[in-house]
């Protein structure tokens, strides 16, 4: 059993690493985008949280295997809980977080949560993760390697084209990939 947080800037490879890890372990990935779990309807977010874990355990039972549970953008609902709750919305959000906390506490399997904002995650949630792995933005040399790997070799480039100059821009791998795709 492992509960892991991958954290770092957008486009640094957190989600890609989770899928690569699953592939190397010969496991499926059951992925959820946490920003889509929150609901404006009373009680719906709590149901959505329970459904994540129920779906995971059902899949384990049906396939007789254990997928990796991937929660993308976990900071969406693992943020600091409200103290001195006054509004009904705050109460519902805290209740949803408490359910999530309980589910993580009792989770059997491998769970990977990704976030761009580790500092926004409530300390009670943070403590329940065995590992916190930072994904840093690539340095100039790493960016150069990324550009060289991603730029199609058969493209007609201008004579003055210099791939080294591209690595001067502080971009993540995800951003470089987007630039290549949208050329």
Where are each of the predicted segments found?
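The conserved phosphate-sensing helix
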Residues: 168-183
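Walker A/P-loop NTP-binding motif of AAA+ ATPase domains
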Residues: 1-165
